[in-house]
C-alpha cells in the first residue's frame, strides 16, 4: 500500500515536484520527493530508501541499513581566501564551486574579531593579511599532493589573479566569468596547518559564546539553505533586517551548500516585543 501510494504521488504530482523543489545540495525542504522522482525515472522503480533518507523518523523506524561509502582520497589541500567583507565572500562562493572543492566554509568579521581575543586562535588571526574582514576556507581532495597543489593553484589563478601560488596552475585551468573579490590567500599543505584552519572554523560556536555581557549570539536563524548564487542577496537582506533593529549577526559555516549558521546578537533580557519582531520578520 505504501509503495502504491508513493508511486501515485510521484505520478500525479510530477509537475508540482519539479516546479517547487529548489535546486539545493542539501535538502531542507521536506521529504526527498525530487530525488525519489529522479531515481524512479532512472531505474523504472520506486526506491523507498530514498524517501526515508532525511525523513528524521517521521515515516518509519530504520532498524538495519546497508550503506555504500566512497573512499576518501589520500591527499587534500586547503586555502584560506580573504575578503574585505562577508558580502564579497558570498559573491565568490558560486564561482569557487565550479572548481569542485570538497568544502567551502565562511568565517565572517564577527567570528574573526572574537577569535582574535582567544588564546587558541589569536596567533592564527594575526597572520591574516591586512584588510581581511571575512574568509572562505576552501578544501580540495586529490589522489596525490601534487594534484592537490595544482587544484589550489588553478583556483587561485581564477579567483585571485596575480597571486603566486606554491606551484604553477595548469595551462588549461578553469577560468570563470565572474568578477573576482578575494584580496589575498593563505595556502595550507601541511596537515598541522590545515588542522589549525579547520579547528578555528569548527570552533565557531565556542568562539561566539565567548562574548561577554548580556548580548549573545542566539541560534534562531539556522540552516536556512539557499542556492549559493543567491547568498550575496540573502545575506545583504538579513544585514538590513538586523540593522533596522540596531544589531548584527555572525555568519559562518557551510557556504558551499548554502547552509549558513546565522546568529543574531540579542539581549534576551530586553523587551519581548523586540525579539518577537525580529523573529517574525525573518520567518
Question: PLM features: what roles do these ranges have?
Answer:
Residues 1-253, 258-283:
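Noncatalytic alpha-helical scaffold of FAD-dependent oxidoreductases
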Amino acid at each position: 500500500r505504501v509503495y502504491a501510494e508513493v508511486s501515485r504521488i510521484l505520478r500525479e504530482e510530477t509537475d508540482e515536484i519539479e516546479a517547487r523543489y529548489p535546486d539545493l545540495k542539501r535538502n531542507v525542504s521536506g521529504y526527498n520527493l525530487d530525488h525519489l522522482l529522479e531515481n524512479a525515472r532512472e531505474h523504472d522503480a520506486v526506491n523507498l530508501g530514498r524517501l526515508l533518507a532525511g525523513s528524521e523518523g517521521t515515516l518509519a523506524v530504520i532498524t538495519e541499513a546497508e550503506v555504500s561509502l566512497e573512499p576518501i582520497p589520500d591527499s587534500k589541500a586547503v586555502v584560506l581566501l580573504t575578503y574585505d567583507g562577508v558580502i564579497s565572500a558570498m559573491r565568490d562562493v558560486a564561482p569557487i564551486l565550479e572548481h569542485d572543492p570538497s568544502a567551502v566554509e565562511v568565517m565572517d568579521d564577527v567570528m574573526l574579531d572574537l577569535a582574535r581575543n582567544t588564546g587558541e586562535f589569536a596567533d592564527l588571526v594575526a597572520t591574516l593579511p591586512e584588510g581581511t574582514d571575512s574568509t572562505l576556507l576552501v578544501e580540495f581532495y586529490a589522489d596525490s599532493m601534487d594534484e592537490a597543489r595544482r587544484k589550489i593553484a588553478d583556483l587561485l589563478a581564477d579567483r585571485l589573479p596575480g597571486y603566486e601560488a606554491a606551484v604553477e596552475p595548469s595551462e588549461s585551468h578553469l577560468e570563470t566569468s565572474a568578477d573576482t573579490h578575494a584580496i589575498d590567500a593563505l595556502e595550507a599543505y601541511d596537515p598541522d596547518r590545515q588542522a589549525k584552519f579547520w579547528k578555528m572554523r569548527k570552533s565557531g560556536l565556542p568562539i561566539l559564546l565567548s562574548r561577554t555581557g548580556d548580548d549573545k549570539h542566539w541560534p534562531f536563524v539556522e540552516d536556512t539553505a539557499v542556492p549559493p548564487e543567491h547568498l550575496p542577496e540573502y545575506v545583504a537582506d538579513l544585514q538590513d533586517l538586523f540593522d533596522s533593529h540596531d544589531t548584527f549577526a555572525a555568519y559562518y559555516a557551510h557556504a558551499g551548500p548554502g547552509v549558513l549558521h546565522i546568529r543574531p546578537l540579542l539581549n534576551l533580557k530586553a523587551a519581548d516585543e523586540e525579539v518577537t519582531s525580529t523573529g517574525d520578520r525573518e520567518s
